[in-house]
């Protein structure tokens, strides 16, 4: 799967690069919204807590639903991995994919993130958010 480096606009506002802001980056990359706008929205939903050390799933879920995104589960407990971070196994379009301890943006088969999180296309996709 192809990979393009993108911090979602974080470097315009913050110097540190090794932070846990994958939810903010993935959403900014997928929506085209400004990093700081997404950061502030998630922080507000997270009771004022920073989004640079991880964002609770409930916060991300609430925000994305408010933005018109739909959750598509690709895995259920006990079923094993059915979909990997692999172009042939994902639909075309813009997706925010949920991986183990990570969110990333995939646009038409290309990963937009700060690193190639596909693990050579073996990484399991638990599900994805798509705008309907």
Q: Model-found features: residue ranges?
A:
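Active-site nucleophile-adjacent alpha helix/oxyanion-hole segment immediately C-terminal to the catalytic cysteine
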Residues: 1-52, 57-68
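Conserved active-site-adjacent core of cysteine acyl-enzyme catalytic domains
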Residues: 46-101, 107-116
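Noncatalytic regulatory segments and standalone regulatory/sensor domains
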Residues: 113-132
